[in-house]
Amino acid sequence: MKQRLYIDTSVFGGFFDEEFAEFTKPLFERLKNGEFELLFSAVTQDELSAAPERVRKLVTSLKAENTEFIETNNEAVELATNYIAEKVVGQTSFADCLHIAIATISRADYLISWNFKHIVNVQKIRGYNAINIKNGYRELEIRSPRDFMTYDDND
């Protein structure tokens, strides 16, 4: 069974960013090769609607058969609101909380992001997962694309 990856908006932008491309492009190659199942949410779609054309083309280049589209629902909104109510992050980070809630509810194996301030942050991850467990969900692994690099065994 393929691992289920929820990729937030920052990773799509990172593909074209000099600072992040080195680690983002190999992840997309692995996605295109069908190594993972991509979880793509309505939140990500909405955020990318204003992105440059090359970013939107990157989205459409991914294979539909390896992608699950996930709508935002009341359960996700409630969980995201809970993260804020419990002060894991502030009110201005609601969209980030929605990404985490959707990934959690959709049983993603990993949420992948380049957002180190609000998402890929040890203290924040602890907070999100404490609330997930308190609400009957499993913990969510939150990583950056760098954690998905493959290395030659001869190195």
How does the language model describe each region?
Residues 42, 73, 146:
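Residues at the C-termini of beta-strands that transition into short coil/loop
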Residues 1-40, 46-61, 67, 85-91, ...:
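Short, well-structured N-terminal submotif of metal-dependent ribonuclease cores
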Residues 39, 70, 141-143:
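General small-molecule cofactor/ligand-binding pocket signal
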